[in-house]
Curated annotation (Swiss-Prot):
It comes from Drosophila simulans (Fruit fly). CDD domains: Ubl_MoaD (cd00754). The gene is Mocs2A. This is Molybdopterin synthase sulfur carrier subunit. InterPro entries: Beta-grasp_dom_sf, MOCS2A, MOCS2A_euk, Mopterin_synth/thiamin_S_b, ThiS/MoaD-like. This protein is produced by a bicistronic gene which also produces the large subunit (Mocs2B).
């Protein structure tokens, strides 16, 4: 992750399998104020050991789903990021 520019602290919430793998329901990370969703996902996967579910994760920024991994995300201090794996069940 390239952090040459300004960096902010973001709250990360983990759900279901991502919570189990990260071994915590929530954390904080420092991220650049502007980053692609792919770069962000790769950083979270590496930092929190989410490799086994990487290809199935959904990210949400301030309660809005990130639909395209090529999207650039603009973060402000204290923003919220949710890491959501697909839910299964019946």
């Amino acid at each position: 992750m390239n952090a040459d520019g300004p960096v902010v602290n973001v709250h990360v919430l983990f759900f279901a399998k991502s919570r189990e793998l990260a071994n915590t329901p929530r954390s904080t990370v420092d991220v650049p104020t502007e980053i692609t969703a792919t770069e962000l996902l790769d950083h979270l996967v590496s930092k929190f050991g989410l490799t086994s579910i990487r290809d199935n994760l959904i990210l949400a920024h301030n309660e809005s789903y990130i639909d395209n991994l090529s999207d650039r995300i603009l973060f402000k201090e204290g923003d919220e990021l949710a890491v959501i794996p697909p839910l299964s069940g019946g």
